[in-house]
Amino acid sequence: KKVKGIGSGAFMKCAALKKVTLKMSKATIGSEAFSTDVTDGYDANGNPKIIKKSHLTKIVMPYKYKGLLKERAFCGYVGTSFTWRDFNTYNEGFLRGCKTLKNIVFPKNLKTIDIPKHCLDDSLSTLKPLVIPEGVKAVYVGQHCRNIKCITVKGKKTVLYGDSGMGAKMISVEKVNCKKG
């Protein structure tokens, strides 16, 4: 039978999982489906006590992924790089909880890039500048993507949009580099 989705918490606490390859382009990936850290309660600050760290270092997805990625879908991912896809629908925060993420790669053939709110909340503050390739017409950045410190735009006609819903600060971008022209 064809897999239509991966349920919420499906691989929860599977710390030995190293690679996820999604071949289906319309599957729904549930909340915390790959929350692979093994925890034992919470510390005094309310943070989970991790007793066995995740080993999930590679996520492979179809280029045109038309499925639904729910909140914290890949929160067990401990890789340092993620290749963005031509997403058309997903919930906010699907990369939330990826604390080792340092680099987001945007393919050159994308026309629009939509970074949902809360997507990069928990990434380290060492997240490298986002480099938007030439040919991208529009970039939409949702609320609370706190760790985006710099965006480098390679195209002369790329438009950067932000979401400032309900008066909240959308992002704390310190620097935007644009190609002259």
Give the residues covered by each predicted segment:
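Short, aromatic/basic amphipathic alpha-helical patches
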Residues: R72-A73, G162-K169
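Consensus positions within tandem repeat domains that build extended binding/scaffold surfaces
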Residues: G7-A10, S31-A33, R72-A73, G93-F94, ...
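Structural signature of tandem-repeat unit edges
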Residues: K1-G5, A15-T28, T39-L68, G76-T89, ...
